UniProtKB/Swiss-Prot annotation:
Name this protein carries in UniProt: Putative pre-16S rRNA nuclease
Keywords: Cytoplasm, Hydrolase, Nuclease, Ribosome biogenesis
InterPro entries, per database record: RNaseH-like_sf, YqgF, YqgF/RNaseH-like_dom, YqgF/RNaseH-like_dom_sf
UniProt function note: Could be a nuclease involved in processing of the 5'-end of pre-16S rRNA.
GO BP annotations listed: rRNA 5'-end processing
Membrane-traversing stretches: none
GO molecular function term, any single one: nuclease activity
Annotated SUPFAM superfamilies: Ribonuclease H-like
Entry similarity comment: Belongs to the YqgF nuclease family.
Superkingdom of origin organism: Bacteria
A cellular component annotation (GO) from this entry: cytosol
CDD domains: YqgF
E.C. number(s) listed in UniProt: 3.1.-.-
Length: 154
């Protein structure tokens, strides 16, 4: 189920279980995971499967492997706060994901996270090709970190 309120999302989470975060892109999907205490977000991997069915299967595998209790998906919003064409694609994906798993899903504004992730990796001297291969997982961890920080203030 897609939850639009962070307090409601938090209320539905199991104690001592991690969250998974998704940075959903048209070519690749970044995945991040929190620790069980939900105070640290870490990049996990990139999914490059072509079909939604394969993407969802990969996600379900990670959710089961890490025993995640909730999902955070980055929602592309333009700089004026409006949803974009990509927002509709992400929302549709989230709706499809709800058919395969019964976990709360929270959509988090992801403005500028991929750019911030790329700049973060660049600051460590990582070459462009490697940055482009990893920036979506780092962006997913930044999206998740935003939610974790907000949850820990509740």
């Amino acid at each position: 189920m897609i939850i639009n309120n962070l307090q409601e999302f938090y209320r539905l989470l199991l104690p001592n279980a991690p969250l998974i975060s998704i940075d959903y892109g048209s070519k690749k999907i970044g995945i991040a995971i929190s620790n069980q205490e939900r105070n640290i977000a870490m990049p996990l991997n990139i999914i490059t499967e072509a079909s939604k069915k394969a993407i969802i299967a990969s996600l379900l595998e990670k959710i089961e492997q890490y025993k995640a209790c909730g999902i955070v998906i980055g929602l592309p919003i333009d700089m004026s706060g409006m949803q974009t064409e990509q927002s509709a694609i992400v929302i549709k994906f989230a709706e499809e994901l709800t058919k395969s798993i019964n976990l709360p899903i929270y959509l988090q504004d992801e403005r500028l996270t991929t750019k911030a992730a790329n700049n973060f990796l660049k600051s460590f001297g990582i070459k462009r090709k490697e940055r482009n291969n990893n920036d979506d997982a780092v962006a997913a961890s930044m999206i998740l970190e935003t939610v974790l920080n907000s949850i820990n203030k509740l």
